[in-house]
Amino acid sequence: MEKIILVDGNNLLFRSYYATAYSGNFMKNSKGFPTNALYGFTNMINKIINEECPTYMIVAFDKGKTFRHEKYEQYKDGRIEMPDELKVQFPLAKELLTNMGIKYYECDNYEADDIIGTFAKYCDEEEDFIGTIVSSDKDLLQLISHDVDIKLLKQKDYIRYNEKSFKEAYGIEPINIIDLKALMGDSSDNIPGVKGIGEKTALKLLHDYKTLNGVYDNLDKLTPKMREKLENDKDNAYMSYDLATIYKEVPMEISIPDIKLKNKNSDKLNEMYKELEFYSFLKKEEKKVDNNIEVKIIENTSEINVQKDSAYYLEILGTNYHSSKILGMAIYNEDNSFYIPFQILEKKHDFLDKLKYTYDYKKNYVALKKHNINILNTNFDTMIAGYLLEYNIKEDISYLANSFNYNIPFYDEMYLKNKSKSLYEEEDIKKTAKAALLKAKFIYETKNIFEEKLKEEKLLDLFEEIEMPLSKVLGDMEYNGVLIDQNELNKLGEEFKIKIELLEQSIYNDAGEKFNISSPKQLGEILFDKLQLPHGKKNKSGYSTSIDVLNKLLGKHPIIEKIIEYRTINKLYTTYVEGLKNAICRDGKIHTIYTQTLTRTGRLSSIEPNLQNIPIRNEYGALIRKAFIPSENGIIMSGDYSQIELRILSHMANIDSLKKAFYDNIDIHTKTASDIFKIPTDLVDKKMRRIAKAVNFGIIYGISSFGLSENLHIRPKEAKEFIDSYLQTYPGVKQYMDDTIKKAYEDGYVRTLFNRKRTIGELQNKNYMIRQSGERIALNTPIQGTSADIIKKAMIEIAKKLEQEKMQTKMIIQVHDELVFDVPNNEKEKIEKIIKDIMENVCELSVPLNVEIAYGKNWREAK
């Protein structure tokens, strides 16, 4: 028997799109092109082929209005118009299918269901064929027969129905799905059915009378009320029957031989996968790069011979390299290549000066330094180069390598089993050695390619002068770590627990009952059903109880303030008190990981644990910082740029009045309030300054009047007046914004003062809201990115100075505009001058950079 797979293409793409469209995981490639529907679609198509092993396959698509619209003009009325982000993915889905060797088809005046129905009928009539339909559309259940089954897709799986299992589930025959739709209607297709009859009632009628005709032939046996409903809507019922019936005689220009699976066009498929940045699919296609490599495993230190500049790759088991096991190192150049197991590597280091090129130098540097192995001559990191060139960089090198057609196993495939990240397979040294050597080969062979691209994109200086030197600086910060006062954390934890318990009891008293405060559903029922507080629209999961919703309810009931405080303290306790305690290493320190290749603006981020997210604007968050302490006989010192982004804005936009205020060391928010409210500075009150501050920083992020109104809890009209007044007061800012956005549209990207580049694909989108988002990115990136570049330069220069002066001071934390140091008491005065001098003079702008120095016996006091 030959198998035919019949796929509902529209259904698959819609499902894939909406699975992530509003979840925070909306996929785009680095150019901003939406890819979420395509990714899910491609994944499902591959899965179908692997599971079903068909000989024939057709993917059917809708093509505009059909004969059903002629019968009923309102057919499918009320459906939300297809989003532009989904619409643009349809042509590429069809192109992907063609390159996968799969036939797709669409036909004027007919739906995808009708095309599927026509081929399903063929399976029924021909003895040598069986069919499987793939869709989540229940309309297609009517096509189930002896020779046709259906995989009805669910959220994370599917249900397979054949004649027997369908009847067991529904109690009717598959063909009676048409009768069911005729009675109950279908809101998704705007099929009216009989008013007042739902699925449960319709199924009961069909159990008793089999068909729609059977129901109408037995009206006298029904209750008067039911009979009235059916009589009143008889025309609608029969029209609905016609609309729900899948047509099986579509006049198609293709036949069975045309839908036989063909060979893939791997070259074109790979090109598409690279363009879409579907690196996980690349590994499944044939590669152009030779995957064969001699696997030489070093057994004795005498065999190690490195005469030329080489690429290297450190194979590490685990994602947190502060505690992970090093398996070994692969070394590659055009003359020789070999793999050194770690127990051999530990014994010989005299060749390390030849190791010049790698992937994720910081990881290698820190992991080896923990074993007293110093690798200091690396000058090219492919991970950083790829990041600056806007490749989709991940921790696993295989994603980048596969985009260059290197067939390298992914980390998960190598070391994880059962998809559990805590269970590692036994190390197979030959497998490990080959994978590591292929990675080193990729690094070596593409080094010049990346270098040329960096030159072409005017990014080489940024790479060589900032990002590469910074990776070692960050490595030293991670290695040094920051000392934690565990007693202080424990004490704080106990205080938080007591406060949480008191708040819980007070909230229960206000609510009049006990409930799960952390459950949005239960909280929503208490606030909006029981206490009758104003609320938004209720959705399937209940009322929204987000912080934005709660903030709007402040002052309307005492319970609101307590809930906000409860959430704040509870998060601090679980995320920071307990989280930080779990992250403390044997040396009593926390060793975070600074990621250099994550944000599009160039800002650094911190993970495992995140030290940049510890709240400082509330009293409880500030208490967490008390636990960060210096080494013995030392202090914590902080150097913090004052209003650096506003200074960069005044430089870029060339605003004389703002520049003068910075030169005269006038409070910029008071100055702005004075200007926009047109009053002397001594008459500016706290509220005016707060508004001016919100506008100052909002302008940097391209804030809308609605956004400002939300921040300040004022009407959008009032917020618009503040923004308009600001832009009239500082016309240079408006000119700068207009010029920046215009140039971004022309070029497709923006740059920082140090040439960091960010491509903004959102500007090419047809959707107005997405283009607006792109414009905000265009305004913010040059400012925030320049700020990130400046502090990076300062970090490099400070690290150099500390080394030159042979000082014991250690740089231990970076939080956006702030650097934190562990300073011996006897170096306090000297290091304060060094930090301030370097941070303020590392970059020459038309306004002065100002750094505020603070110190104390813990991080909280150094603020």
Tell me the role of every PLM-derived stretch.
Residues E2-V134, L140-R160, N236-M239, T245-E253, ...:
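Noncatalytic, basic helical substrate-engagement surface that gates or grips nucleic-acid strands
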Residues I4, R15-N50, I58, E73-Q74, ...:
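Conserved RNase H-like, two-metal-ion catalytic cores of nucleic-acid enzymes
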Residues P54-I58, P91, M100-I102, E125-D128, ...:
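Non-catalytic nucleic-acid-binding/docking modules located in mid-to-C-terminal regions
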Residues E106, R160-K181, H322-K455, I466, ...:
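Active-site-proximal helix-loop-helix substrate-binding element of RNase H-like nuclease domains
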Residues D233-F342, L355, L423-I616, I635, ...:
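Conserved "right-hand" nucleotidyltransferase catalytic core of DNA-directed polymerases
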Residues I331-D335, L388-K419, A435-F442, Q596-P680:
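Function-dense linear segments that define catalytic or interfacial modules
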Residues L423-E425, Y479, C585, H591-T592, ...:
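Conserved catalytic core of nucleic-acid polymerases
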Residues I498-Q505, N509-E561, Q728-P782, N826-K863:
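C-terminal polymerase-core module
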